[in-house]
Amino acid sequence: MKDFLLCTDLDRTLIPNGSHPLSPGAIEQFKQLVSLKEATLTYVTGRHRALIEQAISNFDLPRPDFVIADVGTTIYRINASEWQHWDEWDSEIAPDWRGLAHDDISNLLKDFPVLSLQEAEKQNLHKLSFYVPLQTNVSRLIGDINTKLKQSDIKANLIWSIDEEAKIGLLDVLPISANKLHAIRFLMNKQGYTHGNTVFSGDSGNDLDVLLSDIPAVLVANADAEVRKSVAEADTATLYIAKGGFLGMNGNYSAGIIEGVAHYLPEIDTWLREQNLAK
């Protein structure tokens, strides 16, 4: 069996925190899969470290080998229980901001009174996260921020979302090259993985850049309807949509991840079926 890299989103992909049911035994089979010595497991998530560790504890998730966190702005190597910040990734994305960091960019945006910095744990060297009142004209705000940053030759990606529960807007300011796809490619290159032994799994619009790339990917069966529509229109050859039925499971969450890995890696398909028969 050859070595393989499995990169997966967390919320509603590996973590069964959506409205769809989880197949009994699916997470146990996932743990068995990633415990193989040939497997390198990477979590790819918008969560920051504390929330990732909380999820690992709350949902009894396997400890990964790598974590791509904070919407692609941070990469960690995990050795035993030690999280090692991968400084080389910081150097990779730093040129987008001309070597400037969090506090420098924050100072550039000090003239926007509607921006309130989020808590310290939601910030990092290359990520500014703000709260924004919902009554704000968001398109104008984003346009004005982009104009301000371009005046300083800062190449940034602005990500807008809404915290429905708290009724507040959320705005992330990131280097333009800090994203899931670039981070996964960086990891593949540094660790010697190819398209022939890498699989990504996701469920939402935040995963589309990878799902629609040339990296083999699986969309779990519980994915958002809008995402399913987007990928259907794209008709990419390197995307597998979990259907359910593999090993009697429904294709949701970890069951869909397993189904997708088996689709791309025949040796894993054979191994999983043998393990299932042995039960």
Task: Name what the model sees in each region.
Residues 22-24, 222:
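A short acidic/small-residue loop/turn micro-motif
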Residues 108-199, 204-213:
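Conserved acidic, metal-coordinating active-site core of Asp-based
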Residues 2-20, 203, 211:
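Asp-based phosphoryl-transfer active-site loop
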Residues 24-119:
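Active-site phosphate-binding/coordination module
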Residues 1, 174, 181-279:
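Mg2+-dependent phosphoryl-transfer enzymes with acidic/Ser/Thr/Gly-rich catalytic loops
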Residues 17-21, 44-46, 176:
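Short, flexible loop segments at the rims of nucleotide/cofactor-binding pockets, characterized by
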Residues 78-86, 171-175, 262-265:
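Short, surface-exposed amphipathic charged segments that create phosphate/polyanion-binding patches used
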Residues 4-6, 65, 198:
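The start of beta-strands in P-loop NTPase/AAA+ ATPase cores
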